[in-house]
């Protein structure tokens, strides 16, 4: 490709509304342009990267035995009503109507469509297992699209759905998808972790997220420093402390704390160690409970894990915190004065709180706290559960090492769905015993457009993008200095362009009448891994300057050796 026949569209300045580095560099490198909130046009450079990501995904899915299909973006509402998600999905589901006023949705996902297809196409257990995938546009009407294509409303996704007659068969495909995803992200040159995850609203029995490690990530990725254990923050278990509860050394005392409405204020004003404080949170109880609320207690320096809390049998789903009015109606005190002593609703405490002694907590009286509280002496030990987020330095749940926490960008997710959709939509085949058998499902997603942004978040410097070789838009940039004035430079540039292209190498030759500084800046911004610079001065010595984008190292290579050198560097 020649720049004179290409839409380069680079920008010198960073657009003001681009918050994260991937969004900034995708705009500056001429990869995308914003059409409307959360909607982007992909320009030629961006499409080249996108297609490389797609091709790697497609190759590994095919290698894993999956079969490619293509389903409509527009889906009839009847399928969503049948699955029960028409009411459940919320405002992210874009609902539309055709000219006959028939309701449809712009698909955010395709579980309903694939399940409808399979129930009409399959009739026997002998046809299973099968795993279907597509690479298709999705639309989710995000309330606040941000970070460019990282959280856009329209995006490209690889979604796969497998069908089985047994849990064992599902597990085999799940393991194959886990391995395929690991190959996909490894081939792309990404530093990632596969982490255990909560199944969330999709449901099912097992789930793993594939997280690309990056400072701009929205997720906390938890992993051991001494083993393969990895999980997301919602799933990671906070191991119970090994140390027994220390004996009481203080009497419980009611203390005036009129200006301490938060743990931070209490600690600062009374010079308390934060590890000796407890915070109390009131949440809605399940319907028909004797009490409308449940009290959840965590140590002052810990955070409640809302996913874990929501799974408690006493707690309503979705997790809903009590309002100040509801709290005052219960204990006649504000949220900053709550504690376990004389709490009139069921109390559940975190494992760490269970081993505390001589601790401080609200007295359920405005402006007052109890200091020196001890379990069993001042208040009975309540039910104990793991309800907090882990923190760095906690012991790993597998007993090997301690936990580290890094930020991650979720680029893939695999689920064992079970029979959630097949039961709702009556997707069944004739089993080996001749009776109808509801199908067991798995689903497996990769955010193709998000992978592009995540790769940039992990691969950039102050000059631009530093693409992993496998997904770079071009492999080699040829920069002929003053080629319009030097026949020798022009002739060699054309010769190398033809020879490299004949080797199947993707080349961008900058044949613009531009200053060398502009040419260098654009190629570094775009992130092409290998650059060769042709200039009369070096050619006097039969030399070509070669530069590797990732480490910035330069070297002179003889003109007769440069093609062989590049072929070896790129193809190995």
Curated annotation (Swiss-Prot):
UniProt protein name: Proline--tRNA ligase
Tagged with keyword Nucleotide-binding: yes
Function of the molecule: Catalyzes the attachment of proline to tRNA(Pro) in a two-step reaction: proline is first activated by ATP to form Pro-AMP and then transferred to the acceptor end of tRNA(Pro). As ProRS can inadvertently accommodate and process non-cognate amino acids such as alanine and cysteine, to avoid such errors it has two additional distinct editing activities against alanine. One activity is designated as 'pretransfer' editing and involves the tRNA(Pro)-independent hydrolysis of activated Ala-AMP.
Segments forming a coiled coil: none
Pfam families in UniProt: HGTP_anticodon, tRNA-synt_2b, tRNA_edit
GO molecular function terms listed in the Swiss-Prot or TrEMBL record: aminoacyl-tRNA deacylase activity; ATP binding; proline-tRNA ligase activity
Record's comment describing the protein's domains: Consists of three domains: the N-terminal catalytic domain, the editing domain and the C-terminal anticodon-binding domain.
Source superkingdom: Bacteria
InterPro entries: aa-tRNA-synt_IIb (IPR002314), aa-tRNA-synth_II (IPR006195), aa-tRNA-synth_II/BPL/LPL (IPR045864), Anticodon-bd (IPR004154), Anticodon-bd_dom_sf (IPR036621), Pro-tRNA-ligase_IIa (IPR002316), Pro-tRNA-synth_IIa_bac-type (IPR004500), Pro-tRNA-Synthase_IIa_type1 (IPR023717)
Subunit structure, interactors included: Homodimer.
Membrane-spanning residues: none
Subcellular location: Cytoplasm
UniProt GO BP: prolyl-tRNA aminoacylation
Family according to the record: Belongs to the class-II aminoacyl-tRNA synthetase family. ProS type 1 subfamily.
Record GO cellular component, one term: cytosol
Root EC class: ligase
EC number, as in UniProt: 6.1.1.15
Keywords of this entry: Aminoacyl-tRNA synthetase, ATP-binding, Cytoplasm, Ligase, Nucleotide-binding, Protein biosynthesis
Reactions accelerated catalytically: tRNA(Pro) + L-proline + ATP = L-prolyl-tRNA(Pro) + AMP + diphosphate
PANTHER family: MITOCHONDRIAL RIBOSOME PROTEIN L39/PROLYL-TRNA LIGASE FAMILY MEMBER, PROLINE--TRNA LIGASE
NCBIfam families per record: PRK09194.1 (NF006625), proS_fam_II (TIGR00409)
Gene that specifies this protein: proS
Species the sequence originates in: Klebsiella pneumoniae subsp. pneumoniae (strain ATCC 700721 / MGH 78578)
């Amino acid at each position: 490709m020649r720049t004179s026949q290409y839409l380069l569209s680079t920008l010198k300045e960073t657009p003001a509304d681009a918050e994260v580095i991937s969004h900034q560099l995708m705009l500056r490198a001429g990869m995308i342009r914003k059409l409307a909130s959360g909607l982007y046009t992909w320009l030629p450079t961006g499409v080249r990267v996108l297609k490389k990501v797609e091709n790697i995904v497609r190759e590994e899915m095919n290698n894993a035995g999956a079969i490619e299909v293509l389903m409509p973006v527009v889906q009839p509402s009847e399928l969503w009503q049948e699955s029960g998600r028409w009411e459940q999905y919320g405002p992210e589901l874009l609902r539309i109507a055709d000219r006959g006023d028939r309701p449809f949705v712009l698909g955010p996902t395709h579980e309903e469509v694939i399940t409808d297809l399979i129930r009409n196409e399959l009739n026997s257990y002998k046809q299973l297992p099968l795993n279907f995938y597509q690479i298709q546009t999705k639309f989710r009407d995000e309330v606040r699209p941000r970070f460019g294509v990282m959280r856009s409303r329209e995006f490209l996704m690889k979604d796969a759905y497998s069908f089985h007659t047994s849990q064992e068969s599902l597990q085999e495909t799940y393991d194959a998808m886990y391995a395929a995803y690991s190959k996909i992200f490894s081939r792309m040159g990404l530093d990632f972790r596969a982490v255990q995850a909560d199944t969330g609203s999709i449901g099912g029995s097992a789930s793993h997220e594939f997280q690309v490690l990056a400072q701009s990530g929205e997720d906390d990725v938890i992993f051991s420093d001494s083993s393969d254990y990895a999980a997301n923050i919602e799933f990671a278990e906070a191991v119970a402390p090994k140390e027994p509860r220390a004996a009481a050394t203080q009497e419980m005392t009611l203390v005036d704390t009129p200006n301490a409405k938060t743990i931070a204020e209490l600690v600062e004003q009374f010079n308390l160690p934060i590890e000796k404080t407890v915070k109390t949170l009131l949440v809605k109880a399940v319907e028909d409970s004797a009490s409308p609320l449940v009290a959840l207690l965590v140590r002052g320096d810990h955070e409640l894990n809302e996913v874990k809390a929501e799974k408690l049998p006493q707690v309503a789903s979705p997790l809903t915190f009590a309002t100040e009015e509801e709290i005052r109606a219960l204990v006649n005190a504000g949220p900053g004065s709550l504690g376990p002593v004389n709490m009139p609703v069921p109390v559940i405490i975190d494992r760490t709180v269970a081993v505390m002694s001589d601790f401080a907590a609200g007295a359920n009286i405005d402006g007052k706290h109890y200091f020196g509280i001890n379990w069993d002496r001042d208040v009975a030990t309540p039910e104990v559960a793991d309800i907090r987020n882990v923190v760095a330095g906690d012991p790993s749940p597998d007993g090997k090492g301690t936990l580290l926490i890094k930020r991650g960008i979720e680029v893939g997710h695999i689920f064992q769905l079970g029979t959630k959709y097949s039961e709702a939509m009556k997707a069944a085949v004739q089993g080996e015993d001749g009776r109808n058998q509801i199908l067991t499902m798995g689903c497996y997603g990769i955010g193709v457009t998000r992978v592009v942004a995540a790769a940039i978040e992990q691969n950039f410097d102050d000059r631009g993008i530093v693409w992993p070789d496998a997904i770079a838009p071009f492999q080699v940039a040829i920069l002929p200095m003053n080629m319009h004035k030097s026949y020798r430079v022009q002739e060699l540039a054309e010769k190398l362009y033809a020879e490299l292209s004949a080797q199947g190498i993707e080349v961008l030759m900058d044949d613009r009448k531009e200053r060398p500084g502009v040419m260098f800046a654009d190629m570094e911004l775009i992130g092409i891994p290998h650059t060769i610079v042709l200039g009369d001065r070096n050619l006097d010595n039969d030399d070509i300057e070669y530069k590797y984008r990732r480490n910035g190292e330069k070297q002179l290579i003889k003109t007769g050796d440069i093609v062989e050198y590049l072929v070896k560097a790129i193809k190995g």
